[in-house]
Amino acid sequence: MKPFTALLGAAAGTHAADQMALATLPLTATLVLGAGPDLLGLLVAAQSAAWLLVSLPAGTWIDRMPRRRMLIVALALGLTASIVAVAAAATGYVVLLGLAAIAGASGTVVYVLTSVSLLPSLVAPGDLPRSNARLELARAVVSLAAPFVAGLLAQHLSPTWGYALAALGAALALVCVLALPEGTAPTRGAERPTLASAIRVGMAFVVRNDLLRGISLCAIFWNFAFFALLAIWAPLALGPLGLDPAHMGLAQSTYGAGLILGALAAPLCARRLPPFVTLIFGPAVSVVAASLFLAAPSGNGFALAAAGYFLVGFGPMLWLICQTTVRQLVTPSPLMGRVNATVQTAIYGVRPLGALAGGLVAAQAGLPAALMLITGAFALSTLVIVLSPLARLRVLPAPATA
């Protein structure tokens, strides 16, 4: 098996396991363990907290240990977590289910950060856009399918079968990772500072690098806006738009279609368009999408909302693949884990703030005001790119040296 093929198979298995676990947790907690909304909220929060708690230390270890070994650790953790979750459901221990959720999500965090850091050593620089697109396509497809599969299992068998499928996905991913070449640690023992110092070095590199700083700020504003949109979507759809729950879900599902088509189109865009076009298009088309949501209450609510969700899937997926490639090229290999962890921590840290802001503004000033906030944040994400050197990036940068 070729190294990239092994990594692609591992990506499909890992994201399938992660998305099945995400979809299965609330079903298991509610239908099997009888958890109420308060306890369910704690379980979902625990699962989501892994990105904030684990990313920065994991990024440092990714730069210290052979990356294949880190992938094995991550997948073994995910596999164990799925098995423990089944045991928790069978015995009725909610705390054990929460611990399994944290462990499984932590394994996903380590896997994602490691795979992004490992990819530049497996493919030529010119193949990075296509390779990143294929990895993102695998993630998008399983993310779209997992909730439906989990729901069918819960309806016809038992919610815990979702964890069995998650364990199978993690096991298949582990088999693929074992086919990767051994590799060596990016940094040697004599070069290793303390954990805190190593994390600060990664943060400082992101702040000092003009391209990485622009990417990070754009992602922060965009994620703030998107999670504000998610927070107000149900009251917007069921209220001013007049949608029933089925049409509400159908409109939102176009987001997944946008992700998949964006991942499919990304290699062609990388060949035909200079990077700055894609980097501006992604956040700019999100402003257009926000305008569609603003106009939706005046008529054709379903069509406008569906088009809006499609655009915030399609354009930002193109942007994500392009910026990931730029990030991989400008970051030296010994810093790759910490740089990726810094960016991801900032993104996941701002998401709950966006959701909170969207909900508060909608409650205090109304849904139109919340939509204006969302439009403004998407516009800021575009402005950050336009004012940064990313807007002048006509070719991909040369790979950084260690």
Where are these regions (language model features)?
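Cytoplasmic helix-loop-helix junction between adjacent transmembrane helices
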Residues: A100-V141, P147
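Helix-loop junctions on the cytosolic side of multi-pass membrane transporters
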Residues: S117, S121, Y163, G169-P193, ...
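C-terminal transmembrane bundle of multi-pass solute transporters/carriers
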Residues: T5, L52-R64, R68-V84, V95, ...
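Helix-loop boundary and gating motifs at the non-cytosolic
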Residues: M1-A49, A204, R208-Y255
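Residue-level signal for conserved functional micro-sites within the alpha-helical transmembrane segments
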Residues: D18, L22, S48-S55, T108, ...
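Glycine/proline-centered helix-kink
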Residues: A23, R139-G151, A231, A263, ...
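Helix-loop-helix hairpin linking two adjacent transmembrane segments in secondary transporters
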Residues: A138-C176
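Loop-to-transmembrane helix entry/capping segments in MFS-fold secondary transporters
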Residues: P37-D38, P125-L135, P245-A246, S333-T342
